[in-house]
Amino acid sequence: MSTLLDVRNVSKQFTMGGLLSRRVVNAVQDASFSLSTETPEIFTIIGESGSGKTTLARMILGLELPSSGDIQFRGKTVSAKGSRAEQLAFMGNVQPVFQNPFEAFNPLKRIDRYLESTTRRFLKLTQRDDIDGAMDEALQKVGLSLAEVKGRYPHEMSGGQLQRAAIARALIPNPPLLVADEPVSMVDASLRMSIVNLLKSLRDDLGVSIIYITHDLATAYYISNRLIIMQRGRIVEMGDARAVLDNPEHPYSRLLKASVLSTEDAGDGKLATDPAMVKLASDLVARPGTLESRGDGRLVRVY
């Protein structure tokens, strides 16, 4: 079985503070997982703010270098220090979709100009009809068309439309892997499922694998094949998405599920969270533990 992405014992430390108050923050600690080329999947990274999920995504994209460990895409180490040709080839294979579509586009630049520059850069097209055809093909994949976006600026589109345009731009090089960092968190609630269903169709219909980064357990349950749950930089549970979220084993995983508003307490605005569970999950942060396999194929951090 060929490996598309291989994350091996990756850690990332940041030095924070000034000369007299310097401290090291362990943003990601010894993370490992892999994606296969055989079966496209949506692999989800779940965690609250500060869990390390975005830092891990940035390292996969080559925007940050690991402090230790190795990330390989199709057998080659991901590095921000490669030649321009190597970086361009990698960018054509691994494309990002960022959280806020309004920050992904220059407000003074037309959407079709962005799409055109991406088309010229990665597909090396020069003829007007060929460029327009490639842009329209990418837009059709996300439920838009070139006629709908041509001549329009970002502020003239809704958040949902703009995020679709951002995904279309990412699809122009025909990448086998997308890294989507909280792609629905800045989109109106009424439009979120349309973006989630779009990601699902990219996997099912186009064969694109997606690393989906979120704190939203509901969408993770809906679209994920496998997932990891991160707490303070460490993977605490990994496995089949339904198995893990139906019956989470690690205290932090159980806490995440329990913190979702229950139907019984929704009217009172209460969270179904056990204080003892909160304390246990917090106490375990300082203990490294080890990942142990279970009969259903999942890995759970034990202490």
What are the residue ranges of the model-derived segments?
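ABC ATPase "signature
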Residues: 235-239
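Short catalytic/signature loops enriched in Gly
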Residues: 17-19, 24, 240-303
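A short, proline-enriched helix->beta-strand linker immediately N-terminal to the Walker B motif
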Residues: 172-176
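Conserved ABC ATPase signature
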Residues: 153-157, 161
